[in-house]
Structure formats: structure tokens, C-alpha cells
Amino acid sequence: LPDWFVFQKLLAASISHSIVESGLDQIGGYVTEASSVVGLRTPADLLAAYGVDSAPEFADVVRFEQPRIATFSKPSNSDRPWRDFPHGFLLGGSLAPVWRMSRTRFSYGAEYWRIRSDGEQKRLSRYEGAARGWVGAKRWRPPSPIVGTLARWQGREYFADVIAENVLLTAIADEGPAGFEGVRPRVWSATVPLSECEVFERVFTAQVDGVPVRILRHAGENAEVLLLSDEPADAERVDAGRVEAGVFEAVVAAGRLADVHGVENQWVPSADK
């Protein structure tokens, strides 16, 4: 993986809908290098590179900077009921490298684009961090504290969006910390130097009926989980739904979570250079 660049992700219709309707702020799964697919100028060309023979009126993509702390792996070479990329490249002549990216929040400045069949491209929205979310989305969903970057600053923890040498901190509280600006009810934001922050993420994993999962959100008696297996039989066992190729999610009773483990991954800025 190169040191730093912009990714592009082809969006399943359900994900496009969730961005617009409910402010979906998480991303993962198959991603490719944006500069390697600039020649795929129509929905048909783009979908063909993913092994889909279709020519819809439009296709939606999101373009975003490499998220901090996200991890990348080669696609599976197992036999699956969907098109995979065992050689690590999209299909056809683009030779665009493709990776599977761990689940994280969108990086600040991510852009949601629509590519039309006549080749026109139009930016529909832009992600402006944990506090503000997607511009023009119908709803804002509070970020999950166990998906995406956090920061410690002056002894407190905040949601964090790293922007060059600064960090956009977000607090969700009845009253904002001193110097923070109110963005929406109970949501506060401030920009501070990166050098004053410790940036990290928390990842919780568990087992549900023997299937490995990552916990995405824990609310009351239920938990939203991402399967860490792309085996269809595992998805069926826990009644998980397929979000996109190779990605399964489920809402389960918290009591079904076994062998829960948490890890804190620190971001070292020099590691990205």
C-alpha cells in the first residue's frame, strides 16, 4: 500500500441510501485507488471492473483520503457466491489495485459522487466530520465510540477528525467544554493542534454462536455487529444481512456476545510518512 492517497469505493444502493437518509458515517470493505480508475467514466465501465454486467443510468462512489488507523488486506481467494478479486486487482484493463479495508469512519472531506451514463460526474455531498456529518443529509447519526478515530486532549476523550496538522474534536454532552462551538443540540466542536493530541481507536471483537464479529455499536440490550467472516454459512447462522459483497452485519441481543475483547490502536503520525 502506498504511503498516502485517495481511495474510491463503489457504493451499493443500500449504502448510498443510508448516506442520504440517515447520515451513515462508516465505511469499509472493497476500496481501490481513485487515480487508477479515472478511465472508468461510465457506470457500465465501472461495474464491469467489478464483474457486474449492467448499464444503469448512474453509479455512486465515494472518494476519500486514506483513513487514519484503518487496516488493509488483500481480497479473499476463497470460492464465494459473489465476484472477488483474488489477484488483488479489479477486472478488465484498468489494473486498479483493490483492497479490503477495516471498518472505520469516513475521513474528513470525503466526497459522495454520482457518475451518469453520459459520463457526467456530479458531487452530491461532502463529509465534514463527526459533529457535522454529510452536508445535506436528511439526518445526522451520532458517531459510534468504537468505530473510527478518537483523541485524548487535555485529559478528556473526544471523537476526532484529523485534518492535516490539526484535529477537529467533537464532544457529545449537555454542556460543551470551554472554547467549543455548538454545532447542533448536545454536539460541540473545536479545532486543536495535532501535536497536543493522542489519536487512537477502540476495537471490540466477540463471538456470536461461534462466529467472530466486531461490535459496531452497543445500545441498550442490542448490539450492531460486523461479521469478521465472509463465509455465507456463518452469516446464515447468526441471521446476518449482506450489506455488500463479502460484508455481513447483524443486530443481536447483547446477551449473545461471548468472548468479548477490546483493543486500543494508537496512531503514530510518522508511520504514515
Residue spans for each PLM region:
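Short, surface-exposed polybasic-aromatic patches that bind anionic ligands, especially phosphate groups
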Residues: L1-K273
